[in-house]
C-alpha cells in the first residue's frame, strides 16, 4: 500500500464537472503545502475547467546549510554555492513520492497529459527531476525561483520532449541567484525543449503580475 504525502487539496470547479485536470505544486524549503493555497483563486482560471490542485507537505529533515535544523525539506542542501551541493538520494526519494501523487491522479481519472508539475525554489528542483524524467506525456512543467539540481542524474524522457516548460525568476533573488534560472533555461533550450522564461523585479518570492501570467499559461496548456 502506497504511503502518500499529506497534501492540501484545492479544487477549481465552478461548473461542478468531474475533475479532469490536476496541478501538483511543491513548496520551498521550510514552508508547507499551505504556502500557495491562496494563489488558486487569484489565477483567473477558466470557469470551464475542473482542476484539482495538490500542494504536498515536504517531509521534515535536517538541513545542513541551516545548521542541521530540522524543517520541511524535499532534500538536504549541503552547500549554498552556485553549484548547490545537495543530497541527490533525497531528491530522488522525494521525486518518487511526487510520482506516486501523479499515479494517484491518473487512477482517479486524470489523464497524464492533463497533469502539471510545478514547484517553487527547492520544490522546483524536485519538479524538474519528476517531470523531465516522467515516462508519460505531461501537460507541463512550471518552475519558480529555482535551479536544475540533477541534470546529470535525470533520465530525460522522450515522452516529454515537447512538454511546455515555464521558468520564472526574480531579477534580484538573494537566495537562488537569477543566473541559476538562466542556466536551467539555456540548458533545456539547448536540448530542444519548449521553454518560456520570464523575470520579475522581485526577490525570492512571487508577485501579482506573475500569478496572473501563471494563470494565463495554465489556461492555455490545460484547455
Go through the PLM ranges and name each one.
Residues 2-114:
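Serine-hydrolase catalytic machinery in alpha/beta-hydrolase-like enzymes
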Residues 57, 118, 144-145, 168, ...:
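Alpha/beta-hydrolase-fold catalytic nucleophile elbow
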Residues 166, 182-223:
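C-terminal catalytic histidine-bearing segment of alpha/beta-hydrolase fold enzymes
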